[in-house]
């Protein structure tokens, strides 16, 4: 889960990383009181999870409370690289900046360790610095057990050649950033720029944090960090039902058991779709191993609620998940929707194989629902689902 800048700033403050004061708002007029509290001037910063805000006009200085309101009015609702601005942060203006640095901690998946990246050339994309001046970027592996001690922080500072007058302050901030990284179960903690100001202080002016969704059970407060305004409503509904669902841009709804089978199903449907108007998969939905009839019903309800879906392909290989449970789930889901008075018009193609496949097929045959078609091979079912989706578009 990627955080907004204001959320990253709050986490930094929680772990005693020096930051500037600021508050997030979603209405322009609220900028007035905050700016007055900050001394009559502020920086209005768009809160979007994408870089390049400044170049896009999403970061503006305000020399008065009235100007802050005007800036907030301009920025709220702005589109920045496909992201709509729903909130802005009204932040304290930074003292005169003398130098800008870059520091981060991240999970190095390739080497199965943690990594520190630091540079005295901050304020720009670190990828640009690495490409043009690789010697200016210091990469230091971090032992998962030892972590970042004051001694390790000094090693990072020396490797990146930070000026002597800020070495101790940067080292102290590195220890606190590591504390943030570990205690918040982060995958990335980045400060860019980490600025030396005219007073000699070193302050985190902008930050990026990505948290590990798999660790959310350890952090009840993470729930409040989710961006509900930008969330796809189908993905949000699936999350509430503990379903592994990702919305895609096609027309064939996909349900399968096991991530590998679902990924294969996406490929087979995409291939079949080439012969049927280039229809594509509309989603990834894994109901998992041992899924009950209720889980199947929940998944089907999500997919049938997607207006882009024209047909549904249910592809199940019974192992822990018994095919009769899946079949019962399909029958239950259709009955549930119809009992609510909802119009179910999208055809379902069902392929069942493996554990209790014959019983599952019999349940579907006995139910005799006009929208459900049984196809007993994966390729044949994919072709039929693509054909039906294409026909529905005509």
From Swiss-Prot:
Cofactor(s) the record lists: Mg(2+)
Keyword Repressor: no
Domain ATP-grasp: from-to ranges: 9-237
GO CC annotations, alphabetized: cytosol; succinate-CoA ligase complex
InterPro entries in the cross-refs: ATP-grasp, ATP-grasp_succ-CoA_synth-type, ATP_grasp_subdomain_1, Succ-CoA_synthase_bsu_CS, SUCC_ACL_C, Succ_CoA_ligase-like_bsu, Succinyl-CoA_synth-like
Entry note: cofactor: Binds 1 Mg(2+) ion per subunit.
GO biological process: succinyl-CoA metabolic process; tricarboxylic acid cycle
Binding site for ATP: 45, 52-54, 92, 95, 100
Catalytic activity: succinate + ATP + CoA = succinyl-CoA + ADP + phosphate; GTP + succinate + CoA = succinyl-CoA + GDP + phosphate
GO molecular function: ATP binding; magnesium ion binding; succinate-CoA ligase (ADP-forming) activity; succinate-CoA ligase (GDP-forming) activity
Keywords tagged on the record: ATP-binding, Ligase, Magnesium, Metal-binding, Nucleotide-binding, Tricarboxylic acid cycle
UniProt binding sites for Mg(2+): 192, 206
Pfam name, any one: Ligase_CoA
Subunit structure: Heterotetramer of two alpha and two beta subunits.
Protein known as: Succinate--CoA ligase [ADP-forming] subunit beta 1
Source species of the chain: Streptomyces coelicolor (strain ATCC BAA-471 / A3(2) / M145)
């Amino acid at each position: 889960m990627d955080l907004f800048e204001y959320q990253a700033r709050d986490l930094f403050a929680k772990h005693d990383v020096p930051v500037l004061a600021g508050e997030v708002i979603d209405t322009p007029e609220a900028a007035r009181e905050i700016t007055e509290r900050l001394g009559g001037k502020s920086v209005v910063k768009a809160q979007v999870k994408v870089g390049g805000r400044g170049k896009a006009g999403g970061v503006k200085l305000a020399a008065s409370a009235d100007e802050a309101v005007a800036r907030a009015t301009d920025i709220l609702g702005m589109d920045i690289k496909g992201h709509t601005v729903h909130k802005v942060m009204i932040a304290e203006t930074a003292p005169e900046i003398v130098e800008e640095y870059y520091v981060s901690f991240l999970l190095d998946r390739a080497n199965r360790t943690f990594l520190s990246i630091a540079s005295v050339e901050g304020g720009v994309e670190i990828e640009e610095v690495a490409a043009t001046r690789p010697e200016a970027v210091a990469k230091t592996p971090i032992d998962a057990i030892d972590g970042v001690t004051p001694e390790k922080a000094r090693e990072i500072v020396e490797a990146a050649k930070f000026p002597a007058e800020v070495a101790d302050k940067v080292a102290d901030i590195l220890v606190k950033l590591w504390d943030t990284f570990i205690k918040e179960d982060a995958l990335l903690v980045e400060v860019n720029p980490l600025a030396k100001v005219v007073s000699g202080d070193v302050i985190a002016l902008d930050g990026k944090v990505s948290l590990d969704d798999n660790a959310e059970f350890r952090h009840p407060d993470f729930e409040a960090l989710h961006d509900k305004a930008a969330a796809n409503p189908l993905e949000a509904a699936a999350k509430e039902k503990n379903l592994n669902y990702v919305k895609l841009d096609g027309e064939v709804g996909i349900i399968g058991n096991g991530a590998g089978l679902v990924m294969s199903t996406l490929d087979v449907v995409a291939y079949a779709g080439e012969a049927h108007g280039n229809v594509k998969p509309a989603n990834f939905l894994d109901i998992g191993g041992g899924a009950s009839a209720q889980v199947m019903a929940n998944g089907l309800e999500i997919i049938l609620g997607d207006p882009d879906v024209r047909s549904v392909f249910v592809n199940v290989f019974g192992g822990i998940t018994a095919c009769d449970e899946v079949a019962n789930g399909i029958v239950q889901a259709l009955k549930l929707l119809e009992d609510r008075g909802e119009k179910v018009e999208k055809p379902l193609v069902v392929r069942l194989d493996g554990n209790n496949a014959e019983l599952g097929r019999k349940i579907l045959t006995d139910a005799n629902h006009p929208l459900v078609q049984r196809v007993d091979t994966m390729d044949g079912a994919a072709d039929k689902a693509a054909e039906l989706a294409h026909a529905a578009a005509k």
